């Protein structure tokens, strides 16, 4: 219907014959009246012709002045007159005020100014003024075209100026009208002429410096004005956006309102223009206006002060020289007076000598000689004073010449500086007004379209549609009531408007009308119009802007026929009365509710984050999440996340709604790193990722990033918000410097930095090596024999490898966080030309935060101060070589935490065992528990056994440690000699202790615990190709054959892993002490372990060779290949060994499974159960290297009670060594130790221990399917 009426309105609008198409701007509305009335006025036509004739004459006068006299003054006068006439014509006839005409006039002014009149003569006059003549013709042609279009009625909107020419705007007079005097004409002097004119002035330097200072103050005022204006505009745009959003939501709820779609479009235009203005303001504050101008101003101030200081020094030198000249002149005058006195005294003495008698001649001669000597001395002093005066005069002349040269240089430097500053000011000013003009142009076009649309509306149109829709609803209501009475009995309990529920289903005509109406609206929220007006017809709260909270829960909106079901709202944390509770619990109607529904708080200013919440009233005192104050009155609560805050805090709220209950406040800054890292899947704290990503998005080019401090109050607010909202904080509202301060504060307040305290010394030593390499590089650059020296790339590669090894010793979360931070800092360094932050600056900033020693109460020494430079140097090195040090992949996060509170150690992902990398493969391990305990009986039996042996050293513990040792060897071999760090060893030791103490079930534990023994894992992958040839051949043989051949090999492996022979075979293996070994010191063992790591190197694929020391100690090897005869291997000094069971014994045990267990338990012994001992599958006897044969020895069981064994023989297992179960154990050759290290104490007597019911089945299965433990 609206579209139909628009067509009718357009038909009624008939333009008159001479009338132009109208626009909403002021100038074009003026054109309408002029075109319709003024053009037909004869007086106006006569006046227009006179003005055009006058303008034509001025053009001719200017051309004649150029061709005839060619005097600069005359030409400028003619040009001044021409521009005055043109300006008067454009002011009098607004139709001729065109952008093209103004551009042509400016072009003419520029061409005239560009002519150098000193070079003009009769020969080159035409060449020099060719462009001037062309500009004159262009101006005349443009003026003629605009005049023709005006008279013909074809004036376009594009050619007209949007704003009329005013006295305050930039007129032609301000551009071109200048004085006739050439000495005062702006821009007519060359740089040399400017310097020469200033040199003639005695105070030229002071004047130039004064101008530079005034320029700085002027620029400061301009920048201050722009900044304050932009801040006010930014605040205004935010308020406009909030107001527009609230108004748009409110007017969208009312239907059939006049010009609703028009005002919705206007609100959308306000929001869009506000967003564009915010982007423009951000650009102007960054690199379009403020920052370049401030940078130029600071540079001007710096150079001005330097020049002023230099000029003052030169003047002081000149003053000293002039003072010396004055003193020399006074000295000359003084010496001359003394000489005159001595000369007169000599003259009087000669006269006395001539007039005296002969008796006094002798005395007079003596006096005469004395005065003559005094006269000569005075004469000599006069000559010396004259020489000094001449020297001072010469010095004064030289100094004066130097002062003039310095003066000339200073003036030249100041002139260049002023020109550069003017150029910058010009560029940023063009940016400022150009961006504002684009903003205003888009706003003008939007207003134009809105004005045209408003003219098309017919009054009363929406009211007519409302009446028509109401009549249709009434008819449908009557039909619906009749149908209900005929089909079903009346239902009580509904309000008077219950029957209007059926109005939702309208006839086709109503649907078409609704679609036609919605097609012309810009934004209509909620369901169809009838539903909103159904409530509005029976309640005045809608018309006054109130909410629908006064309706009860049993209203029409929750009737069975309503497809918009209302769900009960989440109850508030406060206590309220029954009526208020109903008001608060009722959600808004579908037309009201939405993602940005404000409800009763629509008049409250809200931030972007606050608009994401759905607030309701709060009636009980609670703590505000924004200011952390107590909310007593005027509190609000989100329905979804239950966030509580004051109404006044909604304007500054930065926590976004997560649509689920918000977690409580966490302790983030100053908290343990592991507490925050374990909550993240990759171990990287969320505050690090949020701050780094925000900085990379908008501040990589910001000058002084991470060096300039932010606002302290805003920084504290952001820290508080991160502790309250965590990932849901909107940090885009904060400045980049504030975000940088938060990141630095988090790193600085960590109790232990990313690089752990125990690795501090190693990293400091690495930094010292880096310093030595840098010094060598500098020396090689200075040395002329640099080409003969080898390149330093080898040293750098060595340092890179060492740094990689040290970083691998960090836990996974520390490594990943450090990796993430260093890569982020590398991106900052990549933009160092813009942000002025290179890797050295960032190293100085982040060095003490990432690497610091353990805090002590000792006083600060010089060596501790020297570590600051090493810390900065190390971080600089990590940033510079980040791509080589970090491979780009993060380490997997630990799935369990060690018993001591630390995170389990991590290894490189490429060398992780398969059981560590895929959790799915660990499921078969957990399922194996059913093989051991399938009934409550077994579990109870095991519990009682564990309790009875809790106070006695168990042989089972030794077996478990030995199993873990075998896994450690296999892990080291598979990883090609990669040594695990001390933290990993200590963490694994603590896990072993806790498992020995607290474990009730001696069965398999989780996949990360070291005391669990993996058994009967299905082989899901082929064996690695790095196996020896005989092992590969073994895989191709039958299971029975493998069983027969692998028995001895495994026994030899077990013997090599036995602590009895550790002195021979595992000299360089890491050691640890379990809690049962009382006589050992942890620190001593750790030092011994470090020495052993330094002395020996693990080789991956070396075959095990048992030295001749075995036979010297009485080790007897008896190997039988038959399956019916057991393999017996004995050792005289170790009598308590477990023989390998034969096939007959296996069959006997199988038959015994069917028998029920005896009611009386046999006496317990220290003999370990079979399911916990080392399994002995068949293995080839051949070695993997050459044709050497490996002696096969049994596994010698050593109980944990041997506390007097040397510390080198106490072994420690490594977490993640379960990969030994997936492949064969490759023994590693070890050098022989000393004889005293090989001496072992005797093993105490062990006794048998009863087996569980289900263990026999596992042993039988074990004999059939060989697996490696």
UniProtKB/Swiss-Prot annotation:
Function: GTPase activator for the Rho-type GTPases by converting them to an inactive GDP-bound state. Has strong activity toward RHOA, and weaker activity toward RAC1 and CDC42. May act as a specific effector of RAP2A to regulate Rho. In concert with RASIP1, suppresses RhoA signaling and dampens ROCK and MYH9 activities in endothelial cells and plays an essential role in blood vessel tubulogenesis.
One GO molecular-function entry: zinc ion binding
Comp. bias regions, Polar residues: 1128-1145, 1162-1172
Pfam families according to UniProt: C1_1, GMIP-like_FCH, RHG29_45_N, RhoGAP
Protein name: Rho GTPase-activating protein 29
Coiled-coil regions listed in the entry: 296-418
InterPro entries assigned to the protein according to its UniProt record, in alphabetical order: AH/BAR_dom_sf, C1-like_sf, F_BAR, GMIP/FCHO2-like_FCH, PE/DAG-bd, RHG29_45_N, Rho_GTPase_activation_prot, RhoGAP
Domain (F-BAR): residue spans on this chain: 192-462
Region called Interaction with PTPN13/PTPL1, residue ranges: 1266-1269
Record's subunit section: Interacts with PTPN13/PTPL1. Interacts with RAP2A via its coiled coil domain. Interacts with RASIP1.
Biased composition (Acidic residues): 1259-1269
Compositional bias per record (Basic and acidic residues), positions renumbered to this chain: 919-928, 1229-1241
CC annotations in GO: cytoplasm
Phosphoserine carried by residues: 171, 176, 179, 190, 499, 519, 552, 918, 954, 1026, 1152, 1154
Zinc finger (Phorbol-ester/DAG-type): 612-657
PROSITE patterns: F_BAR (PS51741), RHOGAP (PS50238), ZF_DAG_PE_1 (PS00479), ZF_DAG_PE_2 (PS50081)
Positions of the record's site feature: Arginine finger: 707
GO biological process terms held by the UniProt record: negative regulation of small GTPase mediated signal transduction; signal transduction
Region feature Disordered, mapped onto this chain: 472-523, 540-599, 909-936, 1120-1269
Domain of life: Eukaryota
Segments of skewed composition (Low complexity): 540-559
Domain Rho-GAP, residue spans: 671-886
Keywords in alphabetical order: Coiled coil, GTPase activation, Metal-binding, Phosphoprotein, Zinc, Zinc-finger
């Amino acid at each position: 219907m609206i579209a139909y009426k628009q067509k009718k309105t357009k038909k009624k609008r008939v333009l008159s014959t001479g009338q132009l198409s109208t626009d909403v701007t002021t100038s074009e509305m003026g054109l309408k009246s002029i075109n319709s009335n003024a053009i037909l006025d004869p007086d106006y036509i006569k006046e227009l012709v006179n003005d055009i004739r006058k303008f034509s004459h001025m053009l001719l006068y200017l051309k004649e002045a150029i061709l005839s006299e060619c005097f600069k003054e005359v030409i400028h006068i003619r040009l001044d007159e021409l521009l005055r006439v043109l300006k008067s014509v454009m002011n009098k006839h607004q139709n001729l005020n065109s952008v093209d005409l103004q551009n042509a006039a400016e072009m003419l002014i520029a061409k005239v100014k560009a002519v150098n009149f000193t070079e003009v003569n009769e020969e080159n006059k035409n060449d020099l003024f060719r462009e001037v003549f062309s500009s004159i013709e262009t101006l005349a042609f443009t003026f003629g075209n605009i005049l023709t279009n005006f008279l013909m009625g074809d004036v376009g909107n594009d050619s007209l100026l949007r704003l009329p020419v005013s006295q305050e705007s930039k007129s032609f007079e301000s551009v071109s009208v200048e004085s006739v005097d050439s000495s005062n004409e702006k821009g007519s002097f060359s740089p040399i002429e400017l310097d020469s004119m200033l040199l003639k002035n005695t105070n030229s330097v002071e004047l130039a410096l004064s101008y530079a200072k005034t320029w700085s103050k002027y620029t400061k005022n301009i920048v201050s004005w722009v900044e304050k204006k932009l801040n006010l505009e930014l605040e205004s745009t935010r308020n406009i956006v909030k107001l527009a959003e609230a108004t748009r939501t409110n007017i969208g709820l009312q239907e059939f309102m006049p010009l609703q779609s028009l005002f919705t479009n206007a609100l959308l235009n306000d929001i869009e223009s506000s967003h564009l203005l915010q982007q423009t303001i951000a650009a102007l504050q960054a690199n379009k206006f403020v920052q370049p101008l401030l940078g130029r101003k600071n540079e001007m101030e710096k150079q001005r002060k330097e020049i002023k200081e230099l000029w003052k020094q030169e003047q002081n030198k000149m003053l000293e020289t002039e003072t010396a000249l004055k003193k020399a002149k006074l000295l000359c005058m003084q010496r001359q007076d003394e000489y005159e006195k001595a000369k007169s005294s000599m003259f009087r003495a000669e006269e006395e000598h001539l007039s005296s008698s002969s008796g006094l001649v002798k005395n007079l001669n003596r006096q005469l000689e004395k005065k003559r000597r005094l006269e000569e001395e005075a004469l000599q002093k006069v000559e010396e004073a004259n020489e000094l005066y001449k020297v001072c005069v010469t010095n004064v002349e030289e100094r004066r010449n130097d002062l003039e040269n310095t003066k000339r240089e200073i003036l030249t430097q100041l002139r260049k500086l002023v020109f550069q500053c003017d150029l910058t000011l010009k560029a940023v000013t063009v940016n400022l007004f150009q961006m504002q003009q684009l903003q205003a142009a888009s706003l003008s076009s939007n207003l134009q379209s809105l004005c045209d649309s408003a003219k098309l509306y017919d009054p009363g149109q929406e009211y007519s549609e409302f009446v028509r829709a109401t009549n249709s609803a009434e008819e449908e209501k009557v039909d619906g009531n009749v149908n209900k009475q005929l089909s079903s009995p009346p239902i009580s309990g509904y309000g008077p408007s219950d029957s209007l529920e059926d109005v939702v289903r309208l006839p086709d005509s109503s649907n078409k009308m609704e679609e036609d109406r919605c097609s012309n609206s810009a934004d209509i929220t909620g369901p169809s119009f009838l539903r909103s007006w159904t409530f509005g017809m029976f309640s005045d709260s809608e018309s006054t802007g109130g909410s629908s909270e006064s309706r009860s829960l049993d209203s029409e909106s929750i009737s069975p026929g309503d497809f918009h079901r209302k769900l009960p709202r989440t109850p508030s944390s406060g206590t309220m009365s029954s009526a208020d509770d109903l008001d608060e619990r009722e959600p808004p109607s579908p037309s009201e509710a939405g993602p940005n529904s404000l409800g009763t708080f629509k008049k409250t200013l809200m931030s972007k984050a606050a608009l994401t919440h759905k607030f309701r009233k709060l009636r009980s005192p609670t703590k505000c999440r924004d200011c952390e104050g107590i909310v007593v009155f005027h509190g609000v609560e989100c329905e979804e996340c239950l966030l509580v805050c004051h109404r006044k805090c909604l304007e500054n709220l930065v926590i976004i709604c997560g649509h689920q209950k918000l977690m409580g406040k966490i302790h983030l800054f100053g908290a343990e790193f592991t507490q925050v890292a374990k909550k993240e899947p990759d171990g990287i704290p969320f505050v690090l990722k949020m701050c780094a990503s925000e900085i990379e998005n908008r501040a990589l080019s910001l000058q002084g990033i991470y060096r300039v401090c932010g606002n302290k109050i805003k920084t504290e607010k952001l820290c508080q918000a991160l502790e309250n909202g965590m990932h849901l904080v909107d940090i885009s509202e904060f400045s980049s410097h504030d975000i940088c301060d938060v990141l630095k504060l988090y790193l600085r307040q960590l109790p232990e930095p990313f690089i752990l305290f125990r690795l501090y010394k190693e990293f400091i030593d690495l930094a010292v090596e880096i310093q030595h390499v840098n010094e060598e590089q500098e020396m090689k650059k200075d040395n002329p024999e640099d080409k003969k020296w080898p390149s330093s790339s080898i040293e750098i590669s060595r340092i890179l490898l060492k740094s990689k090894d040290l970083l691998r010793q960090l836990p996974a979360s520390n490594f990943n966080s450090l990796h993430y931070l260093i890569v982020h800092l590398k991106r900052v360094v990549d933009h160092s030309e813009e942000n002025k932050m290179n890797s050295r600056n960032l190293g100085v900033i982040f060095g003490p935060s990432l690497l610091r020693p353990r805090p002590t109460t000792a006083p600060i020494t010089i060596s501790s101060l020297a570590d600051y430079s090493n810390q900065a140097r190390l971080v600089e090195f990590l940033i510079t070589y980040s791509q080589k040090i970090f491979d780009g992949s993060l380490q997997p996060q630990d799935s369990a935490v060690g018993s001591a509170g630390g995170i389990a150690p991590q290894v490189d992902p490429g060398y992780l065992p398969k059981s560590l990398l895929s959790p799915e493969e660990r499921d078969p391990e957990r399922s194996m528990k059913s093989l051991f305990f399938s009934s409550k009986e077994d579990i109870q039996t095991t519990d009682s056994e564990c309790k009875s042996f809790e106070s006695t050293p168990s042989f089972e513990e030794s077996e478990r440690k030995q199993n873990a040792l075998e896994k450690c060897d296999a892990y080291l071999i598979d990883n090609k000699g990669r040594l695990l760090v001390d933290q990993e060893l200590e963490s694994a030791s603590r896990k072993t202790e806790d498992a020995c103490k607290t474990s009730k079930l001696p069965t398999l534990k989780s996949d990360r615990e070291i005391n669990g023994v993996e058994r009967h894992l299905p082989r899901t992958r082929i064996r690695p190709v790095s196996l020896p040839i005989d092992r590969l051949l073994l895989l191709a043989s039958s299971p029975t054959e493998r069983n027969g051949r692998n028995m001895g090999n495994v026994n030899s492996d077990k013997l090599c892993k036995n602590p009895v022979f550790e002195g021979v075979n595992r000299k360089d293996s890491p050691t640890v002490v379990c809690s049962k070994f009382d006589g050992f010191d942890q620190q001593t063992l750790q030092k011994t372990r470090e020495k052993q790591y330094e002395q020996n190197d693990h080789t991956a694929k070396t075959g095990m060779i048992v030295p001749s020391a075995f036979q010297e100690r009485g080790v007897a090897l008896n190997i039988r290949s038959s399956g019916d005869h057991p393999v017996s291997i004995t050792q005289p000094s170790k009598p308590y060994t477990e023989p390998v069971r034969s096939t007959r014994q296996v069959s006997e045990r199988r038959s015994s499974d069917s028998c029920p267990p005896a009611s009386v338990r046999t006496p317990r012994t220290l003999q370990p159960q079979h399911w916990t001992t080392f399994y002995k599958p068949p293995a080839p006897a051949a070695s993997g290297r050459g044709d050497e044969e490996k002696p096969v020895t049994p596994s010698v069981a050593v109980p944990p009670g041997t506390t007097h064994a040397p510390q080198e023989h106490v072994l420690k297992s490594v977490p993640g060594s379960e990969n030994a179960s997936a492949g064969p154990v490759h023994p590693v050759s070890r050098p022989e130790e000393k004889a005293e290290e090989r001496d072992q104490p005797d093993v105490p007597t062990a006794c048998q221990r009863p087996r569980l019911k289900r263990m026999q089945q596992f042993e039988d299965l074990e004999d059939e399917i060989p697996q490696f433990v």
